[in-house]
Amino acid sequence: MKLKAIILATGLINCIAFSAQAVDTTITVTGNVLQRTCNVPGNVDVSLGNLYVSDFPNAGSGSPWVNFDLSLTGCQNMNTVRATFSGTADGQTYYANTGNAGGIKIEIQDRDGSNASYHNGMFKTLNVQNNNATFNLKARAVSKGQVTPGNISSVITVTYTYA
């Protein structure tokens, strides 16, 4: 009987000792499912060069067009890329000049011959070919009326979406 009591007591002590040492482990699995994107150009600087007040004899006069490209590469498993343009508007089809030259607004157009203007909120969609897409664009300054000397500046943001 004493032996049974000792064995029972030892078993209870072992159960208590092991249950006191139990610790939970939590496994957390995380990750992200992303849409693959193209390699996009960083900031693009388009210089209109030196322009003169006399280049703008009346409202609507424009500077020479300056061509530039937005070339996207590595567009794997994509059919189309949409570029949406946004910035501070000046009227319905132009961007505001935030520089100190007076009477100037900025125009962005497609170089495909359509003369499509890409003002605030407008977009252009291209088909991806060989994992690449290039937006061929042009920019110029346009007179709103009397032009005064100063610098020209306008920041236009392009947001890309893929399909």
UniProtKB/Swiss-Prot annotation:
Disulfides per UniProt: C38-C75
InterPro entries: Adhesion_dom_fimbrial, Adhesion_dom_fimbrial_sf, Adhesion_dom_sf, Bact_Fimbrial_Adh_Pro
Signal peptide limits: 1-22
Matches recorded under Gene3D superfamilies: Fimbrial-type adhesion domain
Pfam families: Fimbrial (PF00419)
Entry's family note: Belongs to the fimbrial protein family.
Top-rank lineage group of the source organism: Bacteria
Disruption phenotype: Deletion prevents hemagglutination (erythrocyte recognition), although cells are still poorly fimbriated.
Record's function text: Fimbriae (also called pili), polar filaments radiating from the surface of the bacterium to a length of 0.5-1.5 micrometers and numbering 100-300 per cell, enable bacteria to colonize the epithelium of specific host organs. A minor fimbrial subunit, this protein is necessary for full expression of S-specific binding. S-fimbrial adhesins enable pathogenic E.coli causing urinary-tract infections or newborn meningitis to attach to glycoproteins terminating with alpha-sialic acid-(2-3)-beta-Gal. This protein binds to the alpha-sialic acid-(2-3)-beta-Gal and is thus responsible for erythrocyte recognition and hemagglutination.
One of the GO biological process terms: cell adhesion involved in single-species biofilm formation
Region: Involved in sialic acid binding, residue numbers: 138-144
Name recorded for this polypeptide: S-fimbrial adhesin protein SfaS
Main location: other
Name of the coding gene: sfaS
UniProt subcellular location: Fimbrium
